[in-house]
């Protein structure tokens, strides 16, 4: 009930008990728990404000108007005399009208912590080797591939997010299923995202994102694992930004039309990447998420993409990304080909680390096609020279998919091919990765809270985790259950 209406009702009620009413000030209080209105203060009650009587049109009654110095007119013949009628005389100064600040509606009146929301998802994954040397396979994107590593919790995420005010929003995401490098136990809590978006206009088209967040290189890198169709990201793009994140500051421009399309591509189940602007530019440390910075230089990144929408409702997104900086790899003693050595790091301030990537996504309505390709230079182990040096790299992927809605949910069959030739800079000694892989699978979404993926993968990839970095071939059957909350 609005304050003015509330005051009107209270004054109207009092008028029934008295033939004439003076426009007196009235202070009202509301109980925090019961929401009842009181005329006296007490613990647990908040003051609504000070009110005066108004008529049904919201105006002060004549009795509340200030007195005038003019003498009253003589009564008409037969009219009642002043002695017969009690007329309220106002004070010399007019009574104040309601004084509290304008009432706030919706979220405007809430505390910032009341506007935060909590959501998340959990992925439970199972891998089973069915051919080749599957037991010797290793992949940066799935630690449950290999000997005695078949079933586990791949991700367990909680996201705390919301608007602190009109110009600042918060995003905080830990992962409770992490395994730090070198650890023999799993399911540690580790930070993934901790950033603030600072908006410069009311439409929220211009913003700066500051903190640890995804850096805008690679469309699939920006796509949430909760929305991604395939089980793992392509190594060609992910090897440039493993964990997809770093600490930095990035400016994004998202015009209203594009912002709405980015949101629709996620909410409609078309596997969008989210809103990272149609243009982005920024700087970041360059050593990766949750890793100490090892030089005084920053990486620079630029990003451009646009989601086109045809007259028939079909979406097509095209764009490109690039980054440049200097990366400091880690070296350790190895034995390769009967020779034991520790690769020399000839550029302690960091090796040239530059990449350019392009993407095109024809969203599954119902047929879809997704492709990315990257080229560049980065640190890589040179076994012959026993040192790490800057070398060229290239790779990418092509993925086809189909979206079918039916009585029991949604089916999304897919086929993905990927390849990569280049250094794996985040692994010790930055060994050269050789990768050729084909994966076929299907995702079934029986309800919003549940997703099930069944896939077959034929892999040929370098084990970049352990020297002498052999190339292993094998076949896998893979299963993942995802719970959204």
Where do the language-model regions lie?
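Outer-membrane beta-barrel pore domains
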Residues: 131, 144-145, 182-184, 194-201, ...
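Outer membrane beta-barrel
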Residues: 105-139, 143-289, 294-301, 305-312, ...
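Gram-negative bacterial Sec-dependent N-terminal signal peptides
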Residues: 2-22
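N-terminal periplasmic/intermembrane-space "pro-region" immediately following the signal or transit peptide
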Residues: 22-137, 199, 485
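Short, surface-exposed charged micro-motifs
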Residues: 27-29, 159, 359
């Amino acid at each position: 009930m609005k304050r003015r209406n509330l005051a009107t009702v209270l004054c109207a009620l009092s008028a029934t008990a008295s033939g004439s009413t003076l426009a007196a000030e009235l202070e009202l209080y509301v109980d925090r728990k019961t929401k009842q209105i009181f005329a006296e203060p007490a613990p647990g009650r908040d003051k609504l404000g000070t009110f005066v009587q108004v008529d049904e049109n919201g105006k002060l009654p004549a009795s509340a108007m200030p007195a005038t110095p003019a003498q009253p007119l003589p009564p008409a013949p037969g009219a009642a005399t002043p002695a017969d009628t009690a007329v309220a005389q106002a004070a010399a100064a007019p009574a104040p009208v309601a004084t509290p600040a304008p009432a706030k509606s919706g979220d405007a009146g809430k505390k910032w912590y009341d506007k935060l929301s909590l959501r998340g998802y959990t992925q439970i994954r199972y891998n089973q080797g069915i051919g080749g040397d599957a037991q010797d396979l290793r992949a940066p994107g799935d630690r449950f591939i290999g000997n005695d590593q078949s079933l586990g919790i791949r991700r367990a995420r909680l996201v705390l997010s919301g608007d602190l005010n009109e110009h600042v929003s918060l995003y905080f995401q830990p992962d409770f299923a992490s395994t730090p490098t070198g650890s023999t136990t799993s399911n540690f809590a580790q930070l993934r995202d901790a950033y603030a978006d600072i908006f410069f206009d009311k439409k929220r088209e211009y913003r700066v994102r500051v903190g640890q967040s995804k850096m805008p290189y690679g469309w699939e890198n920006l796509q949430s694992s909760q929305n991604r169709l395939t089980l793992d990201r392509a190594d060609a793009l992910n090897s440039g930004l493993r964990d997809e994140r770093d600490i930095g500051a990035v400016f994004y421009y998202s015009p209203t039309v594009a912002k709405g399309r980015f949101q629709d591509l996620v909410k409609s189940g078309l596997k969008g990447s989210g809103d990272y602007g149609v243009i982005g530019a920024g700087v970041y440390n360059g050593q990766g998420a949750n890793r100490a910075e090892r030089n005084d230089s920053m990486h620079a990144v630029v990003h451009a993409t646009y989601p086109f929408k045809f007259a028939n409702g079909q979406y097509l997104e095209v764009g490109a990304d690039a980054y440049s900086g200097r990366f400091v790899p880690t070296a350790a003693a190895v034995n390769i080909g009967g020779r034991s050595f520790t690769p020399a790091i000839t550029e302690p301030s960091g090796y040239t680390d530059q990449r350019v990537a392009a993407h095109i996504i024809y969203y599954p309505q119902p047929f879809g096609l997704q492709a990315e390709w990257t080229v560049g230079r980065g640190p890589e182990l040179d076994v012959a020279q026993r040192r790490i040096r800057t070398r060229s790299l290239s790779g990418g992927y092509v993925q086809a998919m189909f979206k079918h809605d039916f009585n029991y949910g949604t089916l999304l069959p897919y086929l993905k091919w990927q390849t990569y030739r280049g250094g794996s800079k985040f692994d010790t000694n930055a060994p050269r990765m050789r990768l050729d892989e084909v994966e076929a699978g299907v995702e079934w979404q029986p309800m919003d809270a549940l997703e099930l993926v069944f896939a077959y993968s034929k892999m040929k990839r370098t084990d970049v985790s352990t020297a002498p970095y052999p190339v292993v071939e094998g076949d896998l059957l893979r299963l993942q259950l995802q719970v959204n909350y």
